[in-house]
């Protein structure tokens, strides 16, 4: 089983994915938790580049760094895990490229789809959980997290984008989910971590 978690910065993806990992592991599933960028050795190097607030990356450079990370990540981690019958939970995946670079940066979504297909070799998740939350609340969460962990410089580039960018990302995720209703389920993330976890389990029980 391959499940991805998507959403804007500060939507609660990491907390949820850790809860889901614990839950499905306790039910006897062989679970792998991974993320993009940074789910493989190359990805760890690329993550420091693409998320740093100190580098003036162009939109095109940003895109191809994400795609390079994804191609290596799929080949090294996701595809082997799926072939070995493991349950894979991934924090961000190909949908993030469609939304951030397409709806956010204004790139051609058709082209982004084609680039993604090369990187992922046709491996799409069985289910994607989209965590939807008010932009201001989510950014407040993200900024508090980054401040507490000392990540403002090394991983704060997207959080420092203007509010209009984040609104485009939220709207883009919702629009993209509407175009892929069978795979993407929208969850209300403006709630407690426990409620969000219960929402997620209810959805995933239908495909396990």
Curated annotation (Swiss-Prot):
EC id: 2.7.4.9
Binding site for ATP: 7-14
Protein name (record): Thymidylate kinase
Gene Ontology MF annotations: ATP binding; dTMP kinase activity
Alphabetical list of HAMAP family matching this protein: Thymidylate_kinase
Keywords annotated in UniProt: ATP-binding, Kinase, Nucleotide biosynthesis, Nucleotide-binding, Transferase
Gene3D superfamilies cross-referenced by the UniProt entry: P-loop containing nucleotide triphosphate hydrolases
Function text: Phosphorylation of dTMP to form dTDP in both de novo and salvage pathways of dTTP synthesis.
Pfam families linked to this entry: Thymidylate_kin
CDD domains: TMPK
A GO BP annotation: dTTP biosynthetic process
GO cellular component, one term: cytosol
Family, per entry: Belongs to the thymidylate kinase family.
The keyword Nucleotide-binding appears for this protein: yes
Reactions it catalyzes: dTMP + ATP = dTDP + ADP
The UniProt record lists the keyword Cytoplasm: no
InterPro entries listed in its UniProt record: P-loop_NTPase, Thymidylate_kin-like_dom, Thymidylate_kinase
């Amino acid at each position: 089983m391959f499940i991805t978690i998507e959403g804007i910065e500060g939507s609660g993806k990491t907390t949820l994915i850790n809860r889901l990992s614990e839950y499905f592991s306790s039910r006897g599933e062989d679970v792998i938790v991974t993320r993009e960028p940074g789910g493989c050795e190359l990805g760890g190097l690329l993550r420091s580049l693409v998320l740093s607030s100190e580098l003036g990356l162009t939109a095109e450079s940003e895109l191809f760094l994400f795609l390079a990370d994804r191609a290596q990540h799929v080949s090294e981690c996701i595809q082997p895990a799926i072939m070995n019958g493991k349950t894979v939970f991934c924090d961000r995946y190909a949908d993030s490229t469609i939304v951030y670079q397409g709806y956010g940066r204004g790139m051609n979504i058709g082209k982004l789809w084609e680039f993604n297909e090369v990187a992922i070799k046709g491996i799409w998740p069985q289910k994607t959980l989209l965590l939807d939350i008010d932009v201001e609340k989510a950014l407040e969460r993200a900024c508090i997290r980054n401040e507490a962990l000392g990540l403002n410089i090394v991983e704060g580039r997207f959080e420092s984008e203007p509010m209009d960018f984040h609104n485009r990302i939220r709207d883009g995720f919702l629009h993209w989910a509407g175009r892929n209703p069978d795979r993407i389920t929208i969850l209300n993330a403006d709630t407690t971590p426990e409620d969000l976890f219960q929402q997620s389990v209810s959805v995933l029980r239908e495909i396990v």
